Each structure stands twice: as C-alpha cells, then as structure tokens.
Amino acid sequence: MDIKLKDFEGPLDLLLHLVSQYKVDIYEVPIVEVIEQYLNYIETLQVMKLEVAGDYMLMASQLMLIKSRRLLPKVVEHIEEEDLEQDLLEKIEEYSRFKAVSQALAKQHDQRAKWYSKPKQELIFEDAILQEDKTVMDLFLAFSNIMAAKRAVLKTNHTVIERDDYKIEDMMASIKQRLEKENVISLSAIFEECQTLNEVISIFLASLELIKLHVVFVEQLSNFGAIILRKEKK
C-alpha cells in the first residue's frame, strides 16, 4: 500500500498547528495534551510505514522527557523542567512570528509574480481544504488520536495483528453502503469494529478518498472532536 501525506514543515510547525487549535495564548495551552497529540501523530506515521524525519524524532524524545517529568509526583520543584517547557513554548512563539512574516512575504511575492510571469499550476491533494475548512492534515491528526486508542485496545486484548491486505475500493464501497442505511456515521464507531490496524488505516484512507470525491461529507463539531461522515451535505 503506497501512502503519501503532505508533511508539516518541521516539528515546530506541527506543534504550532496543535497549539493553535486551542485558541488561547501559547503559554496557556495544556502542554501535556499537546505533547500526547504530537506523539500520537508520530506513532501513527510509523504504523503506516511513513518516513519520519530525524528532527521529528529528536523533538519527540524531548517532549517525552517533559511529559514524564510533568507526570512525576511534585515532591520538589524541578527548575530544569520549567526551563524545558519555557524554552519549548518560546521556540513555538518565535516560530509563529517567523511563519507570519514568511507568509506575508510569500503573499507579496505572489502578487508581484502575477505581473511578470504565468503562475505555476500545482494540484496538491494532500494540502487541500476538503470540507468545513478541514484539511487532510486536520483529519489525520484527529485520526492519529483514534489510532492511539485503538492500538491500546488491541494491545490490552492481546490481539494478533495479521498482514491482511484491504483494498481501498472495497472499503469505499463498504462505507457508502453503511451511509445508505444510516445517513450519518462516526469514524470512531467504524474503527471500533476493526480487528487489525491495517483495516483501520484502510478505512481512513477510503474515507479521505470519498471526501475528496464529494461522495460523502465530513464534519467535526469541535477541535479534536469526533469525525462525522454524512451522506448529504448539511
């Protein structure tokens, strides 16, 4: 199964995306929640056999250190722990400013380019806004949290993960048939019935394809909330 998803520009870009979902000041975000979502994303990439760059793994190890210290009993205040968190948040804030300036310059460049050259035509599905202002990466991040829970269930149940091959076309047909009966379904409900991680991954990719083709419509009522598939647009 060949899978290609557009990546973030780096670990700080991913962290900024996660932090921005909370709609609060960077220094007010629940840092442990953000760390868990980052780690879920990395683990899901690995399960799906997608390449993970070294800088993402380095950041993951640093975040795991912060998380582990956060979860330890607070017998003595750890100055080093506070420094690690403060340093991380300052880096995210600095990257946020850098990205804003970079985007402003890129916009100016695009405006000038219209007068001097034919604009380059590009079609990147992986970075496209699908529906309800949701991008593929928004759905993938929500999916990675679901995958983390599913992996925990399979591990607890001592489930043997077999190398089953699931055709995306078959999964697309299955989702469409289910929507014919129920009109609205949540991806979490479908995933609960899956027996292997390969099946979960195939269903997710089938859902993305159906959304892209506007065969089904996607809805997420809140950040990090359940992913809902609808037969018809609201």
From Swiss-Prot:
Q: Which InterPro entries match?
A: ScpA
Alphabetical GO biological process terms: cell division; chromosome segregation; DNA replication
Q: Cellular component per GO?
A: cytoplasm
Q: Which UniProt keywords are present, listed alphabetically?
A: Cell cycle, Cell division, Chromosome partition, Cytoplasm
**Per its UniProt record, what Pfam families does this chain match?**
SMC_ScpA
Per the annotation, which location comes first and is thus the protein's main one?
cytoplasm
Q: Where in the cell is it found?
A: Cytoplasm
Matches recorded under HAMAP family: ScpA
Q: What does this protein do?
A: Participates in chromosomal partition during cell division. May act via the formation of a condensin-like complex containing Smc and ScpB that pull DNA away from mid-cell into both cell halves.
Q: How does it assemble?
A: Component of a cohesin-like complex composed of ScpA, ScpB and the Smc homodimer, in which ScpA and ScpB bind to the head domain of Smc. The presence of the three proteins is required for the association of the complex with DNA.
User: What family is reported?
Assistant: Belongs to the ScpA family.
Name it: Segregation and condensation protein A
The species this protein was found in: Streptococcus pyogenes serotype M49 (strain NZ131)
